[in-house]
Regions:
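Pyridoxal 5′-phosphate
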Residues: 1-210
Length: 210
């Protein structure tokens, strides 16, 4: 949410698995900008919130089956026969889960609108996300380049708009000024922005930012 770093998950997964570990990937900041491929990543767990991809406020978790079967029951003692039972201690929210299907409709409509073709739905949606990425890189590049060249502003994260390296989330700071004062100045200039830690509290603290 701050640095916008796209981590080399597959390389990290290979190293983790080499010593018998499991890797959990938090994709909440990536999923809106890139189509996750858990098989290619070879991760054991992948999580994100579907509201980040224009869906309902529901958490989504993929878990490798072999790891899933090692988990302890989180629900009623008599609901321990299936993952669906032991991972829903209070029972599923049927309406919210059902509304996740709207995500497929949303992407299908965008695919049709842009005339994207492909053999499978995933192929078509992958092409759609590639179009998203190209557009995002195009519109963020001028701002990223301006911040890199600025004599006072400091871009947080990789100094590039390359979508393979960073997501199109842009954070910066100006040494000697508070983020609140920068926010106020930009809002006064009718530039939409925000300030704060954006749930990256430890990162902001480690970077020494306010």
């Amino acid at each position: 949410n701050i640095a916008a770093t796209i981590n080399p998950v597959r390389a990290l997964a290979d190293r983790v698995h080499a010593v018998g570990g499991h890797i959990v990937v938090d994709g909440v900041s990536y999923a809106p900008h890139g189509l996750p491929d858990v098989a290619a990543l070879d991760c054991d767990v992948y999580l994100y919130s579907t509201y980040k991809t224009y869906g309902p406020h529901v958490g989504l978790m993929y878990t490798r089956r072999s790891l899933l079967e090692q988990m302890t029951n989180q629900g009623h003692y008599f609901k321990d026969t299936t993952p669906e039972g032991w991972l829903t201690p209070a029972g599923p929210d049927h309406a919210a889960i059902g509304s996740v299907a709207g995500l497929a409709d949303y992407y299908d409509n965008l695919v049709a609108h842009h005339g994207i073709e492909g053999t499978t739905r995933r192929d078509r949606v992958a092409s759609l996300f590639a179009a998203f990425a190209a557009h995002e890189a195009e519109i963020t590049a001028p701002l990223v380049e301006m911040l890199i060249a600025h004599d006072r502003a400091r871009l947080v994260g990789a100094p590039t708009a390359d979508h393979a390296v960073r997501a199109p989330t842009i954070a910066f700071h100006v040494p000697g000024r508070t983020s609140a004062s920068i926010y106020d100045a930009l809002i006064a200039a009718k530039v939409s922005c925000g300030h704060g830690n954006f749930y990256a509290h430890r990162l902001v603290g480690s970077l020494g930012l306010d």
